[in-house]
């Protein structure tokens, strides 16, 4: 077990270093492609312009992937700082940020009051950013999108759950949801790197909890997480 943990730590350190070191050449590619487009765009034919657009799109996607890999590495290395966390307020703030990014979408959001737990505030924010962000994204093709965040009891376990009425998923592949780079939808349908839910799982397990999911294709999804202690609901 000690050797395995040591090897895992070395692998995470390696992943962090590689991801960090990739930033410089990626910035160079982005910068030079921007110069090429702005200074020499008039000399490029339509095919060359399309190829340049694809290069810049690939650079953007690679940048997102690096950011997500660095986040995944950081949540494994960061020391836990447990303190009371108001998840209701945190969720409301995150949903307001999502609305500001996409103000035209009429998403119905229902955040249960009084959701509190003891945990690391910054890491739990990352959990909710990913879960609520996913719900927001995967309801993108629904006429009347709905998202709810609440405390619940599931199979004898006290937990929190983010529910939506979006794209859903095939339950046969639910174990893949929380594995890095495993996606149940194409990037063309719903863009993403496949690292967000793996990050959620790692944070939750560091808190002594667990993550799981239920869903049905075309009918939405429910993503659950526990924090190793009963959720505290109600009160001031």
Regions inferred by a protein language model and the residue ranges of each:
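Short acidic helix/loop segment immediately C-terminal to the autophosphorylated histidine
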Residues: 37-48
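Short alpha-helical segment of the dimerization/phosphotransfer core of two-component systems
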Residues: 57-62
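Short alpha-helical Gxxx[C/S/T] motif in the catalytic ATP-binding
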Residues: 196, 200
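Detector for a conserved hydrophobic position within an alpha-helical segment of the HATPase_c
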Residues: 204-205
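Glycine-rich ATP-binding loops of the HATPase_c
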Residues: 208-214
